[in-house]
Amino acid sequence: MKKIKYFLQFLGIISLFIIFKVIGLTLSRIFSGYLLRLLGPLFRSKKIIHSNLLTAFPDSSEYERKKIIKNMWFNYGQILAEYMFIKDFRKNSNYSKKIIIENFDELKNVNLDSKPVIFISGHFNNFELMAMQIEKLGVDLAAVYRPLNNFFLNNIMEKIRQKHICKKQVKKGVSGTKKLLEHFKNGTSIALMIDQRVSQGIRCNFFNREALTTTIPAQFVKKYQAKIIPVHIERSRNNLFKLKFQKAINFSDDEDIKSITLKLNNILENMIIKNPDQWIWSHNRWK
């Protein structure tokens, strides 16, 4: 039964991709944005989204939460449409010029040739463009990804990611962590999303509630004195993207795994608070 469900989802997405290719990026964003805004509230994740927003913003009004959800689904739809044009964002200057780099000096201030760094972020807006653009800036990069449950779609997505987003893709999990270590020792920087629940993590405050959080960045800091560079991407109303680098974080020797992880969670919180409708709220973060 699950295979049939996944195959039907696969056919639906492929059909949409064909439509996107025919009508072009601008119309695809509008069509897909409104489509997801219409269908999104029907998905099973509806309760999780509402619960997550109440956890993060307990003093928010129902109107404010509904507005965030509505904008999130529209944004989700735009991201879906943009997958069909990832190759263009990679190779076509008319697309890539829509991605503006802010605080590029923060990268220049870190000598990546002598020692790799850990880029940390979350699922903001079209998060796939972050790893793609960092690699295009000349950074030797490995990006961690979580395979899709739908194996029909996952096969396609893995090929898209490896060919057009970031050549060095590392699957999330124990084997992936070993691969990350291998890459890092060979001078490759790491791009890691820290906003999802992980079974191997530690319980750490995130919006004043404990959530299982990855300790991979903290472990690299303690063992290899790795520098952490927070980065996130924002979409403006005219569909320009701003890729924003923050200053590299240096941690003191007396900071432990928990305190480092908490500090990174706090940074992530601030990113979300600034643009709550550009973060994907459908993940069961506090399970």
Where are these regions (language model features)?
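Conserved beta-strand termini and adjacent loop/short-helix elements that scaffold enzyme active sites
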Residues: E102-F104, V144-R146, K171-G173, Q246-A248, ...
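Non-catalytic C-terminal accessory region of glycerolipid acyltransferases
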Residues: K66-K70, N109-L112, K136, V174-K287
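Membrane-anchoring hydrophobic helices of lipid-metabolizing enzymes
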Residues: M1-I118, I156
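Hydrophobic alpha-helical segments typical of transmembrane helices
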Residues: S15, L27, I49-N52, M130, ...
